[in-house]
Amino acid sequence: MIQHAIAKLLEGEDLSRAEAAQVMTEIADGGATPAQSGAFLAALRMKGETVEEIAGAADVMRQRADRVRVSRDVFIDTCGTGGDGRHTFNISTTAAFVAAGAGVCVAKHGNRAVSSRSGSADVLAALGVNVDADKETVERCIEEVGIGFLFAVRLHPAFKAIAGVRRELGVRTIFNLLGPLANPAGARHQVLGVYEARWVPVLGGVLAALGAAHAFVVHGEGLDEIAVTGMTHVCEVKDGAVERYTIRPEDLGLPRRDAAELAGGDAAANARIVTHVLEGQQGGPRDAVLANAAAALVCAGAATDLRDGVARAARSIDSGAAREKLRQLVAATTVPA
């Protein structure tokens, strides 16, 4: 199948959802050589990935994931694509703790750094979370603490082999888009930041095709986040309906911030910023977290709109609830000496 798919792509033809799924299955099963896998990824990138192709690939990623069981009906993910190259601190990871502190169950999917110096796994490890905790521990964290970290590299074993091909290619491929679409717990409520604005409507369409209950796909001022520095492009998906619009910080009741305020560093530096935000320090990092946590609360049904979400997120921080969720997650994932 993969040879047929490569030929189609080189002719500029789109694959159907089923065809894309067949190719991904072949790659996952080891039926494709590294050369074939690389040619497929490059040809697909050159043609441009469609909603159907991404949905078909995501179907297989979801099926092959090591499933994490969650008993709650509503739980969220704040995993973005990464790769925006802006080197901010870990905004969506911090927002996950704020959402948890506001009473929302969080199954946070994430990985090591893509283009930044600190991915979600890196900063969580620096904060004291055992990101390599086994699946049973992760499930217990989600149930008892209300937040758990789903480490992508551990929970998508079928696609370990493709990692070398991706590294050797050295360019973005469909896999840069698939991570946030393949939460191993099956989250149907999520905030998904993308590294380029052109992917906002595309991934909105993909989430609708995959049956998302309520989700926001966002890109703001070059960030795979809701921006407090300017305009954010949004695609909101709710029970099959898709709505596109833009928002500005003022719409959320937040001041406009300078991008330099959101700059991050390595995992240790970012961990300090996360800690300062959760301790209630005012400034650009807090406002960025409030904006993104607000969207998480809305998609979980815990806030009526983004302004209400900002107010509830602020209470989560200022009451100490968000900081307590981090403390509890560290304790729950730490093996006693």
UniProtKB/Swiss-Prot annotation:
GO terms for biological process: L-tryptophan biosynthetic process. Anthranilate 2 binds at residue 166. Its EC number is 2.4.2.18. Keywords: Amino-acid biosynthesis, Aromatic amino acid biosynthesis, Glycosyltransferase, Magnesium, Metal-binding, Transferase, Tryptophan biosynthesis. Mg(2+) 2 binds at residues 224-225. Catalyzes the transfer of the phosphoribosyl group of 5-phosphorylribose-1-pyrophosphate (PRPP) to anthranilate to yield N-(5'-phosphoribosyl)-anthranilate (PRA). Belongs to the anthranilate phosphoribosyltransferase family. Binds 2 magnesium ions per monomer. 5-phospho-alpha-D-ribose 1-diphosphate binds at residues 80, 83-84, 88, 90-93, 108-116, 120. Anthranilate 1 binds at residues 80, 111. HAMAP family: TrpD. Homodimer. GO terms for cellular component: cytosol. It holds the Pfam family Glycos_transf_3. Pathway: Amino-acid biosynthesis; L-tryptophan biosynthesis; L-tryptophan from chorismate: step 2/5. Mg(2+) 1 binds at residues 92, 225. Its cofactor is Mg(2+). It comes from the Bacteria. SUPFAM superfamilies: Nucleoside phosphorylase/phosphoribosyltransferase catalytic domain, Nucleoside phosphorylase/phosphoribosyltransferase N-terminal domain. It catalyses: N-(5-phospho-beta-D-ribosyl)anthranilate + diphosphate = 5-phospho-alpha-D-ribose 1-diphosphate + anthranilate. GO terms for molecular function: anthranilate phosphoribosyltransferase activity; magnesium ion binding. This is Anthranilate phosphoribosyltransferase. The lineage of its organism: Bacteria, Pseudomonadati, Myxococcota, Myxococcia, Myxococcales. InterPro entries: Anthranilate_Pribosyl_Tfrase, Glycosyl_Trfase_fam3, Glycosyl_Trfase_fam3_N_dom, Glycosyl_Trfase_fam3_N_dom_sf, Nuc_phospho_transferase. It is an enzyme of class 2 (transferase).
